[in-house]
Amino acid sequence: MEESKTPHVAIIPSPGMGHLIPLVEFAKRLVHLHGLTVTFVIAGEGPPSKAQRTVLDSLPSSISSVFLPPVDLTDLSSSTRIESRISLTVTRSNPELRKVFDSFVEGGRLPTALVVDLFGTDAFDVAVEFHVPPYIFYPTTANVLSFFLHLPKLDETVSCEFRELTEPLMLPGCVPVAGKDFLDPAQDRKDDAYKWLLHNTKRYKEAEGILVNTFFELEPNAIKALQEPGLDKPPVYPVGPLVNIGKQEAKQTEESECLKWLDNQPLGSVLYVSFGSGGTLTCEQLNELALGLADSEQRFLWVIRSPSGIANSSYFDSHSQTDPLTFLPPGFLERTKKRGFVIPFWAPQAQVLAHPSTGGFLTHCGWNSTLESVVSGIPLIAWPLYAEQKMNAVLLSEDIRAALRPRAGDDGLVRREEVARVVKGLMEGEEGKGVRNKMKELKEAACRVLKDDGTSTKALSLVALKWKAHKKELEQNGNH
């Protein structure tokens, strides 16, 4: 069979578009640079979403997809946290994954590697049964990866809740992080989400390598520390920034309208405001943000979602039913119509960030969004909401110094005065100049590392060569 001569890699993304998108970029590089074939094995608790299908259907023919039957999570309560749901989806998909691997064997296409992402380590069981080397694609920072690798030890040595720690956690090469800023599933050690986080991190040592979506100039000290050989520490390969910077088609007139509006604004004058496809604010915080943007007197393009009490409430359903514009303060649209453009739900983000009129990005610090900003050289206002975003915000504002971070009051609310101060500071102030210059440097570095002789390209080549060597070995042993 002709195809069996080409190394074949199976990739299992955790549920959620934020996990799929960087893996798609990773797969494209494997195909374009190394001539590999890739199969995405998609697990989920329902039928594939339209967004998933659109992304997967647009890929080159050497990247195919298999959709596993939905898993049954009806035994979980409505309060079950997202990390538990994601982990259980992968774990309960193992019987179906075995069938897919059987079909690979029958077709002479046994993968030379299985790649999972951060919560998918239970799929290693299937990889081991079929003698396929397991790898992890880690879609966030080297700093958070260091935390994941250290968590089993931390769990044994700390008895209190991490938020009660009086000293910040100091990991080699990493920015010090207070316990209250640890990622969400580490905030309640009695919750199943923490147990699943711990369960997955304990299995990281079983991987034959970890590919991380970052690059040396962005996190030099953390990457150096991770690459020092150590017990229970697989080799780490920084292969980022893997982001989709190709042209997204603005699907509706409203979406292309926002780009037309940007065309008419002065160079670098617009603050782009978006909390990602999963992030929402409370009613009160939405109100304060709106009034702060108005008071700042800066130009802005705001992707708005209806408020809710849960920061990641639209993680699986990015179009809540209510019109978000009805939640804006009275008179806000009229007051800001000359300077602001408000768009519900979604904007073509890569195009907005690459637009010459965009000069800043108020972001939830999701890592995909952060890397898109780095690639376009756009300085940040860090406004973390959920997952590991607080850890990212600390890294971006205190270590990399590519972001300003507004201060919240004791009640967790960022007041309008603080919003206005930070927005003005980024777009007009001295502080803004510093982060702008830093982002310019990082943009150039991001471009360099992905060139043919760049560090991230070389790191990916090392892994691809390993996989090709494994394929040759299998052929010599007469095993397809």
Curated annotation (Swiss-Prot):
What is the deletion mutant like? No visible phenotype under normal growth condition.
Q: Where does UDP-alpha-D-glucose bind?
A: S277, W346, A347, H364, W367, N368, S369, E372, Y386, E388, Q389
The protein's GO terms of the molecular function aspect are: hydroquinone glucosyltransferase activity; UDP-glucosyltransferase activity; UDP-glycosyltransferase activity
- Identify the Pfam families for this entry: UDPGT (PF00201)
| PROSITE patterns to which the protein is assigned, alphabetical | UDPGT
InterPro entries found in the cross-reference section: UDP_glucos_trans, UDP_glycos_trans_CS
Q: What GO terms in the biological process aspect are recorded for it?
A: lignin biosynthetic process; response to toxic substance; xenobiotic catabolic process; xenobiotic metabolic process
Asked whether the keyword Magnesium is assigned, the reply is: no
**According to the UniProt record, what happens if one changes S14A?**
Loss of activity
Give the catalytic activity: hydroquinone + UDP-alpha-D-glucose = hydroquinone O-beta-D-glucopyranoside + UDP + H(+)
Q: What is its EC number?
A: 2.4.1.-, 2.4.1.218
Question: What keywords were assigned to this record?
Answer: Detoxification, Glycosyltransferase, Transferase
Tell me the residue numbers annotated for binding UDP. S277, W346, A347, H364, N368, S369, E372, Y386
Locate the active site.
H19 (proton acceptor), D117 (charge relay)
> Which family is annotated?
Belongs to the UDP-glycosyltransferase family.
Free-text function comment from the UniProt entry? Bifunctional O-glycosyltransferase and N-glycosyltransferase that can detoxify xenobiotics. Possesses high activity to metabolize the persistent pollutants 2,4,5-trichlorophenol (TCP) and 3,4-dichloroaniline (DCA). Also active on benzoates and benzoate derivatives in vitro.
The name this protein goes by in its record: UDP-glycosyltransferase 72B1
Q: Which species does the entry assign this protein to? A: Arabidopsis thaliana (Mouse-ear cress)
Gene this chain is encoded by: UGT72B1
